[in-house]
Amino acid sequence: MKIKNYILVCILLLVSLSASAQYGKQKKADTLFNKFSFVKASEIYKELIEKDYNADYATRRLGDCYAYMRDPKNAAKYYKKAVEQENIPIEYYYSYAQALSGIEKYDESKEWLKRYKDSGGVVNKNKFLKDGSFLTNIFNAKQQYFLKKVNFNSKFSDFGAYEKDGKIYFASTRDEGVSIKHLYGWNEQPFLDVYVIDKETKKPVDFKDKIKGDINTMYHDGPVAITKDGQTMYFTRNSFLNNVKDKDSKGINNTKIYRATLVDSVWTHVEDLSINNKEYTTQHPALSPDNKKLYFSSNRPGGQGGSDIYVVDINEDGSLGEPENLGDIINTHGAEGMPFINNEGTLFFASDGHPGLGLLDVFGTISNEDGDIVDVINLGVPVNSSKDDFSFFMNEDGLTGYFASNRKGGKGDDDIYAYNRIPLLNVEGVVTDVINKKPVPNAIITLLDGNGKQIAYMETDDEGYYEINIDRNVDYNITASQKKYENDSKSFTSKNIETTVTTITVDLELTPVRDVVKLADLGIIYFDFDKHNIRPDAAKELDKIVKMMNEDYPGMVIRIESHTDSRGSLTYNDKLSIDRANSTYEYLISQGVDSSRITAYEGFGERRLTNGCDGSVNCEENKHQLNRRTEFIIIKMQ
């Protein structure tokens, strides 16, 4: 009996020790996870799943590790298992949807986004679920950007390319030529350093191309932004200055933005900035074209979500104002970062919260006439892909630049791509009245290509303006039409046009039809039986003619013709119709129409009936009414 008890105690002790060991592993994995050492943490979570110790928790954490390591294939694998768990936090629906889009399973991604929303999750307004045609629009959009690989990528992570005065600055985790490497636990790669090379260099990049001065440290450094005069650099770095590492209350070494000065071709005098705080990240500097504003991303409190984009004024003395969040048109519940502002003041940034093709995509802003940002637009393929696309930069020419991506086909982890941009081409113009030169609103614009295929069908705005996006190297025919006018058509071509040209102007002129009823939107001027006075409803119609003649066509000349029904004698009806014509004439004159612009006012009695009510058949009153009318004939328009 004692032996049996001894064996039982041993078994229980072994089970207890095993459980204690697994608990210790989970605690270690969580510690690594919280310190962003996702590679090592993922290995331990796998062990826990194999040992079936708190496997549901380890599965969720493992999916998170792969998501942070930007590995959507493996993230989707474990998130798929996670979302089948009972009482799973709904945030995992969203994470699973993001991972699915990263492996181009867009329909499934959309289903899980909907489930996330239906479960109470917040999906940014105007986003993926709201626009079912989003992906179709992205893939069918006209291509503006044409890519080429650069010769300075490595097998590691390279991004943040920034061109200045014939040199390219970029951040890289490569460390070729260095015997001792410091590795970053997030991805087990070396820490980032800033490199600078000649734009036209053909030689391999190594440690000798690291930027000269005090920019690089043993921690993350880069990317950078440089002022127009080339004398000041803003750059991202882990919180490390004067050999002091400044961690937050959780022991995390967050990023900050530092400023350096160029002295004798060396970047030095590195200084901390007032916008930094060790308790949160401040990173990804970008300068406005006039260098008076600094844009950056941060996960500081009070934002919209994970990380937001902010802007702060740079004062004359170099001090900084108070950061301002750019608001929910740009920032979402997801992550926004890597801002860049081109010469035109357009903000470009990376986001995984706006509708995209998967993971991070590059977006540009749309501003109104006052310069206020009113919307954002996905740059589409080939800049964006199902993987991470970010760190967009545009040269001053507005046509060339760089961005980074970890898409398939690259040399390493994140690769830098150069692009040539061929701007979209528009045809625009104003449709006007050929006589009074006034714009024609609501004119129908029909655009056909050289094969007669309809490319666009639209209406002009209140100012007679239209604008249509077109392809280059195509012949076109455009027609304007409106019920008050004769059509006008013109042919034009987009062939052999310089790529710097973005607009072709084709104005169209419409000739008014010689029909007062159409021009004035006129109803028929009716009279009561055996009467020639102007009824109130007739006065409203005559006022339209007054406006047309005095405001729209001050050179128009008309003739008035009045008619009766068939009841009464021929002689009586002739006189009655003349009286009606005279009443019409007198009303127009009384309202300001010059008498010289009415050549005659005549009565035709019952001679021009509009129907068969000639007295030989019985007709209802409303049919007789149709014959008691006044008409207007255009004699001249100028």
Locate predicted features.
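Periplasmic peptidoglycan-binding/anchoring modules of Gram-negative envelope and division proteins
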Residues: F527-S562, I589-S590, F632-Q638
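Periplasmic OmpA-like peptidoglycan-binding domain that tethers envelope proteins to the cell wall
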Residues: S351, P355-G358, N550, E561-Q638
